[in-house]
Amino acid sequence: MLIAWPDRVHCCEIMLQEGARVVDAVEMAALNGIEQAVGYAVFGVLVTSDHVLNDGDRVELLRPLLIDPKEARRRRAVSA
């Protein structure tokens, strides 16, 4: 389980039953900041909360974007 916010990063390993879903992993991890997650990914691929996990999967909690990536690039290009 991986959660990476601007002010902190937390990674933990949890053991689940075979057939466990993303939502089961999230509940089991009980990390601070989970309520801010707007989505989930497994190894960088978007998944739903009912996605069945495989042994060794890395579940990532996704945070909301603060700014549109295209707009951020435009701003950096202007200031460079």
UniProtKB/Swiss-Prot annotation:
Disulfide bonds: none
Pfam families: Ub-RnfH
Family: Belongs to the UPF0125 (RnfH) family.
Descriptive protein name: UPF0125 protein PD_1376
Phylogenetic lineage: Bacteria, Pseudomonadati, Pseudomonadota, Gammaproteobacteria, Lysobacterales
